[in-house]
Design a protein with these regions (language model features):
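Hydrophobic alpha-helical segments
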Residues: 1-174
């Protein structure tokens, strides 16, 4: 049971354009966004940041979604794990890869470049932060500093979502 109930979408007509965009990407409007709508200005700001972080041309969208999922795995947020897995599949990540994400370090489904990105995602989402210079050195073998910054941006964006949803005990949609 959620600590704070989400608002009804039909009562948020001014936010409908943003809801429609999210619905195109995810297939539904998350309860987390309907709860964020309780704070004036928060949801549009959050959606703006999300658009920059998740739809930038610096890293591929499927990689961004795998990074988001691994960040949520590292933080332990089940709500975000469900959403990122669902969205990753919609972005073209294979079901085999999604099932193997828990063992990305050894799975044949992941390239060394993907492992480097997922390692940063997993380590940076732990408390205390476990990302090391070794993680960044490994990532630099495959990614530019701009690409690494984009990977960390995804981790940070989902750090907010992981904290929000775990704290609010956001209820997963049907």
């Amino acid at each position: 049971m959620a600590h704070i109930d989400p608002l009804a979408r039909e009562d948020l007509a001014e936010l409908e354009p943003g809801f429609e965009l999210v619905e195109q990407i995810m297939g539904f409007v998350p309860n987390s966004m309907l709860t964020m709508a309780r704070v004036p200005g928060l949801l549009p700001a959050f959606q703006g940041l999300g658009a920059v972080v998740l739809a930038n041309p610096i890293i591929a969208r499927d990689l961004a979604q795998m990074v988001a999922m691994m960040s949520s795995v590292g933080s332990g947020c089940r709500y975000c794990q469900a959403h990122t897995g669902h969205t990753a599949e919609r972005m073209g990540v294979s079901p085999e890869k999604l099932e193997a994400i828990w063992t990305f370090e050894t799975s044949e489904h992941f390239s060394e470049a993907e492992r480097a990105a997922l390692r940063i995602a997993f380590h940076s989402s732990q408390q205390p932060n476990a990302a090391t210079s070794t993680d960044f050195d490994a990532a630099r073998e495959y990614y530019s500093d701009d690409e690494i910054a984009a990977i960390v941006a995804v981790c940070s964006f989902f750090g907010y979502l992981n904290r929000w949803n775990d704290t609010m005990a956001t209820t997963l949609e049907d």
